[in-house]
Amino acid sequence: MNSNYLLLPHFDPSIFTLGDSNIGLRWYGLMYLLGFVFARWLAVRRANRPNSGWTVDQVDTLLFNGFMGVFIGGRVGDVFFYNLDHFLQEPLYLFRVWEGGMSFHGGLIGVIVAMIWTSYSQKRNFWQTADFVAPLIPFGLGLGRIGNFINLELWGRETNVPWAMIFPNDPLLLPRHPSQLYEAFLEGLVLFAILNIFIKKPRPMASVAGLFLIGYGVFRFIVEYVREPEVENFFGIITRGQALCLPMIIGGAFIMAWAYSRKSAVIK
């Protein structure tokens, strides 16, 4: 082991547990909770602006549905995208949520389903809902990556950069990229800033959602080059995460082009 690199302490992933059980509050769960609290604060603030088109009750319904979408979609996505073999051998693994395992792409699918249902029940345009939700997401994503870092999971590839870190649960104790922190910065702070600056200017409906898909897809695709793959690469070229990001980037670009082609639907 090279002493020139920072050796991280072994963080306890649980803040507390109930007795000898595995049930309790984990840092990762706390990050999700803080992300939703911040999202509600920001959403209510925007809903209270004149002519926002939203009431606080509608926001709460949307966020509750979104929370369920993230939780169910994130868990199912992690199992089917990254741990399908484990699930086929032990189907009850899907329900052991206290062991961790959440997929962003699965959570995104869950949120989209929740937005479709909420838009239908509130009789509003889906893209109005998607544009309202998109700027709320990145801050929570960043906190989630901090949770990954505390859990000492999803670390990066081996490297010799000066800021490399050694994760104590790495059997090889190699200096690695702190890829969780890269993602927290790019997918969290940077994407949050981009979207919340973008919505301050006139723009066509659906453009905010399209920009979110492009921004997340590009940032995640880049970081995947220094993140240790969870599963084998596709054809030895790209990782599973990069393969899942490509449809996001392409879809986001298509949505942006379509949105700007509809010149009459400009939101000020």
Curated annotation (Swiss-Prot):
Assigned EC number: 2.5.1.145
Q: Report the principal subcellular site.
A: membrane
Q: Which residues form a coiled coil?
A: none
Pathway annotation from the record = Protein modification; lipoprotein biosynthesis (diacylglyceryl transfer)
The GO biological-process annotations, alphabetized, read as:
lipoprotein biosynthetic process
Its placement in the membrane is given as: Multi-pass membrane protein
Q: What PROSITE patterns does this protein's entry cite?
A: LGT (PS01311)
Instruction: Please name the top-level EC class of this enzyme.
Output: transferase
Q: Locate the residues binding a 1,2-diacyl-sn-glycero-3-phospho-(1'-sn-glycerol).
A: R145
- Per UniProt, what is one GO molecular function of this protein? phosphatidylglycerol-prolipoprotein diacylglyceryl transferase activity
Record HAMAP family: Lgt
Q: Which family does it belong to?
A: Belongs to the Lgt family.
- Could you identify this protein by its name? Phosphatidylglycerol--prolipoprotein diacylglyceryl transferase
